[in-house]
């Protein structure tokens, strides 16, 4: 297996959207084409940006959940889904770990990253046709209908529905795996070499924050980019 595309998403919230330029460049630097599903109202003209908005749904809800369905629009490409405020730092981690996995598998990079009722959005990868088999959608119209059917009556940002996407992913993967034994490959953090540069450890002293002796897999960046751009750019330049 080899990753072709990464699916990212954001609405018009600058805390997230500002990451698109640098994060898209990082993904390109490890050989993966970035695709942004933009759910804001003001359309963005860019060949790698897919404008997707539903008036009946909150744009944040769409941004979170459309990532599960967006890969179905690329049936012949192997797609990984990720957060827009996460920067990949290691081609070996993302590509090297799956090079010996067959194209008919669905790969869960971090199966133990959340509680048992969820699967972490970061990261999951499969051919677009596999995503079609799992979620039973294959067009913009069917994706829209699926999202509307998922939309909670009392949705609120940061509320009980905030992890809806990860719970839905768990539900659909469990259902699919029950009928398709040996169709899911789960990686292990230790053997895969997962090593995150995490914003939770942020320090104004770069030497305390960034360990040059570590081989980082990714950078969970502090928000917003406009405030922390010097730090983020420095990490980017050290790795690319």
Question: What is the role of each PLM region?
Answer:
Residues 1-56, 234-240:
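N-terminal anchoring/stem segment of glycosyltransferases
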Residues 55-80:
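A conserved donor-nucleotide-binding helix/loop in the catalytic core
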Residues 83-87:
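The conserved acidic donor/metal-binding loop of glycosyltransferases
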Residues 88-121:
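Conserved donor-nucleotide/metal-binding helix-loop-beta segment in metal-dependent transferases, i.e.
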Residues 111-126, 154-161:
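A recurrent flexible, glycine/aromatic-enriched loop bordering the glycosyltransferase active site
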């Amino acid at each position: 297996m080899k990753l072709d595309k990464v699916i990212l998403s954001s609405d018009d919230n600058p805390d997230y959207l500002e990451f698109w330029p640098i994060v898209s460049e990082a993904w390109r630097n490890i050989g993966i084409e970035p695709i942004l599903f933009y759910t804001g109202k003001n359309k963005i003209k860019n060949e790698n940006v897919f404008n997707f908005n539903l008036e009946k749904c909150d744009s944040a809800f769409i941004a979170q959940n459309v990532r599960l369905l967006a890969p179905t629009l690329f049936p012949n490409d192997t797609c990984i889904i990720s957060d827009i405020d996460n920067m990949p730092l290691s081609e070996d981690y993302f590509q090297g770990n799956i090079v010996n996995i067959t194209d008919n598998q669905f790969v869960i990079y971090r199966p133990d990253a959340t509680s048992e009722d969820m699967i972490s959005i970061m990261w999951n990868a499969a051919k677009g046709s596999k995503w079609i088999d799992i979620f039973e959608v294959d067009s913009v119209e069917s994706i829209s209908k699926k999202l509307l059917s998922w939309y909670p009556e009392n949705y609120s940002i940061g509320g009980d529905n905030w992890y809806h996407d990860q719970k839905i992913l768990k539900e659909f993967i469990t259902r699919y795996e029950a009928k398709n034994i040996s169709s899911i490959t789960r990686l292990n953090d230790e053997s895969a070499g997962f090593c995150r540069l995490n914003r939770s450890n942020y320090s104004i002293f770069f030497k305390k924050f960034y360990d040059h002796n570590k081989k980082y897999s990714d950078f969970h960046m502090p928000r917003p980019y406009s405030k922390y751009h010097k730090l983020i750019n420095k990490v980017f330049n050290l790795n690319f």
